[in-house]
Amino acid sequence: MKKPLLLTLLCMILAGCDNPKSLESFTPEMASFSNEFDFDPLRGPVKDFSQTLMSENGEVAKQVTGTLSQEGCFDTLELHDLENNTELALVLDANYYRDAQTLEKKVQLQGKCQLAALPSAGVTWETDDNGFVVSATGKEMKVEYRYDSEGYPLGKTTINSQNTLSVTAKPSADPRKKLDYTAVSRVDDRQVGNVTLSCEYDAYANPVDCRLVIVDESVKPAVSHHYTIKNRIDYY
């Protein structure tokens, strides 16, 4: 076998020589916002994105859209949760996020553009030395967040006066398929649910099309819910 052909095959086996995009870590802002506003984190120079969750009947259950600066700050963020009839639209203004409609100050920021406080709910966020939000403290609860070495969210633990709810995620061993994960939810020591996500990815190792299965184990027999997630991502 000729050496050039051997090198070409080796590149294909190592999965990367034909892909000019380097694998970037998740930024503190992206990882932390995805935790708080419940969307899948993205990496790379994201300019704007939308994530649409659809039921197995093809109905839109939830949609998240956002725009980011070249520095990785969220300029705008919108959430429409049709299943729970809630919505949120934020726009960046100096050290705050304002309500996009009323212009009321909603979220106070720290550092470059990281979450600091939600005054109306009495919630404050704390960050680690790398700028990732590691805890949220309110009047009657505390949430602790975990990440891996690349900044990927590994779950959270919510503690209140009644119980402890923990979510533990285990991502794929393939670093380019972080969103292929399984997660387990527990109330105290009792498992109440599990989630499986599998995706197709773009050149930045971001998910494009995903299949989500949520199993509710709090009822007998357990009930499975199937969804698809469609992502649209534009880059700088």
Curated annotation (Swiss-Prot):
Pfam families attached to this UniProt entry: UPF0257
> Where does the UniProt annotation place the signal sequence?
1-16
Primary localisation category: membrane
Q: Name one GO cellular component term.
A: plasma membrane
Q: Which domain of life is it from?
A: Bacteria
Membrane topology type, per the record?
A: Lipid-anchor
Q: Does Ribosomal protein show up as a keyword for this record? A: no
Q: Which PROSITE patterns does the entry link to?
A: PROKAR_LIPOPROTEIN (PS51257)
InterPro entries given in the database record: UPF0257
Q: Which family does it belong to?
A: Belongs to the UPF0257 family.
What NCBIfam families does UniProt report for this protein, alphabetically?
PRK02939.1
Q: What is this protein called?
A: UPF0257 lipoprotein YnfC
Query: What is the protein's species of origin?
Result: Salmonella paratyphi C (strain RKS4594)
Organism lineage: Bacteria, Pseudomonadati, Pseudomonadota, Gammaproteobacteria, Enterobacterales
Gene from which the chain derives: ynfC
